[in-house]
Amino acid sequence: MIDHIDNYNTIISTEALDTLTAERESHLQPLVFVEPDRYAAYTGMRSLVIVGDSGSGKTALRLALTRQVAPENTPPTYLVVNWQPEPFEDVHGSPAVRVFVRQALHACATTLLTILVKHPDLFRRAPPTVQMTFHWFIQAHISADRQHLWASMAEQAVNDEGKALGQHLIFEPATAILYPDTTEQRIIAHLTATLQRIGIRGVWITIDGFDPWLRGSTALVSEQMIAILSTLELLDLNGFAIKMFAPRALESDITRSWGIVKGRIELDTLTWTPEQLTTITERHIAAKIGKPSLHLSDLCVADRDIRDWLQRYGGSTPRGWLRLIRPLVDAFAAAGASHPLPHSVWNSLKRTHPPRLSIDLKADRVFIGEAEIVGLQPRSYRLLRYLYE
């Protein structure tokens, strides 16, 4: 049984379950993350696309991979750059890929600068040719607003040496290393080879955050992602990998990309077992009430019924389970969070918070609670949709 918690932690437990998005709870992720079954396969230099429903933990997985290979306070194993999808109007095919690569190079330059400012020893101990290449690459690809960039870098420098290095790399003229008309692929190849000379094995471009672009038509974002994932010149570069975390709505289009067809990119689906979902749920609740650990039996004596309820109506995503259990957590916190709630409270919560019917009209998917109902006959679906609308 868990001990009584103070009012501050009670407030955390009742409010923190509102967001249920990893990017807004990054401080909790090291405490609550559970490795999916194929986690180890995601950590190398192979390009991959991981597909999952909204709330399945794609961003949490991306953040965990980043923490592993690019921890906050030590030099990284890989240069990890997160690129946010932003469909380019009236730009298609190869031109869209070039826009993506230019943006990725800009992000690489900013990330590399941040690493060197935080870890100036990496630069100071590097051979002169490596120092010259980094200086040139950063100058060639950072934003034009260098004063603003410098202000940001100065905040991240851990000592005066880092600040001085940041000023040098941003403002001091750099010697050109490659010709101005050098292809982006050649620039990336030169960058990765240089990074490897200081112990950074390569570059990961992580792509996440599709949801805002899927509220309307998915055609434009699908077309541009297919173009990027079909550019074999990028996918064949040594020390360069794309790791995309994509919603299920894009899966059928992405599978047509040349990179997947030719086996340059691995396609995987993010799934969880009921046991993993239980652990994720328990860890979230424990973190949010300030406890090192917690089990469903600590919330309520009806823990077996609660687990069955979650498996039946919580669906297959962590967000689904956390949404479903939110009323129980609220009741637990309101009661003082010192003793498991009785059966009567759980039975009352089931009556007052029944799982509701919802239909994704765009995707023709039917849900009760957070669980999808599969195998509906067309006639039954049309009737449900008519009543729902």
What spans do the regions from the language model cover?
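A short, basic N-terminal segment
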Residues: 1-48, 53, 68-74
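Short, amphipathic alpha-helical segments that act as regulatory/interfacial helices
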Residues: 66, 105, 109-113, 311, ...
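P-loop NTPase nucleotide-binding core
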Residues: 46-47, 53-203, 216
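Amphipathic alpha-helical "lid/sensor" segments that cap RecA-like P-loop NTPase cores
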Residues: 289-293, 298-351
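Trafficking entry modules
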Residues: 350-361, 375-378
